[in-house]
Amino acid sequence: IVPFLGPLLGLLT
């Protein structure tokens, strides 16, 4: 699991 996915999902939602 990539670490940037966390903040990325937060920005997308």
Curated annotation (Swiss-Prot):
Subcellular location: Secreted
Main localization of the protein described in the UniProt heading: secreted
Modified residues (Threonine amide): T13
Lineage, broadest ranks: Eukaryota, Metazoa, Ecdysozoa, Arthropoda, Hexapoda
BP term (GO), one: chemotaxis
Name listed for the protein in its UniProt record: Chemotactic peptide
Summary of the tissues where the protein is detected: Expressed by the venom gland.
Function (record text): Mast cell degranulating peptide. Induces the chemotaxis of neutrophils. Its mast cell degranulation activity may be related to the activation of G-protein coupled receptors in mast cells as well as interaction with other proteins located in cell endosomal membranes in the mast cells.
GO MF annotation terms: toxin activity
GO annotations of cellular component type: extracellular region
Keywords linked to the UniProt accession: Amidation, Chemotaxis, G-protein coupled receptor impairing toxin, Mast cell degranulation, Secreted, Toxin
Family recorded in the similarity comment: Belongs to the MCD family. Protonectin subfamily.
